[in-house]
UniProtKB/Swiss-Prot annotation:
Localization, UniProt: Secreted
Annotated site (Reactive bond): 34-35
Source organism (scientific name): Hirudo medicinalis
Name recorded for this polypeptide: Bdellastasin
One GO MF term attached to the UniProt entry: serine-type endopeptidase inhibitor activity
Predominant localisation class: secreted
Record-annotated Antistasin-like domain positions: 28-54
Lineage, broadest ranks: Eukaryota, Metazoa, Spiralia, Lophotrochozoa, Annelida
Length: 59
């Protein structure tokens, strides 16, 4: 699953798949799931969590 291929146009900007558009501004999505991830959920460059996508182990 390529998280970078799921983006949303939002006025003059584009939101990542971990964000939603609110009045031409990207904000972290409030979607959650019950998956347990050993290293937490994957985050975008803004710190927003992707729902149900586990983060890789720290290097």
């Amino acid at each position: 699953f390529d998280v970078n291929s799921h983006t949303t146009p939002c006025g003059p900007v584009t939101c990542s798949g971990a964000q939603m558009c609110e009045v031409d501004k990207c904000v972290c999505s409030d979607l959650h799931c019950k998956v347990k991830c050993e290293h937490g959920f994957k985050k975008d460059d803004n710190g927003c969590e992707y729902a149900c996508i586990c983060a890789d182990a720290p290097q």
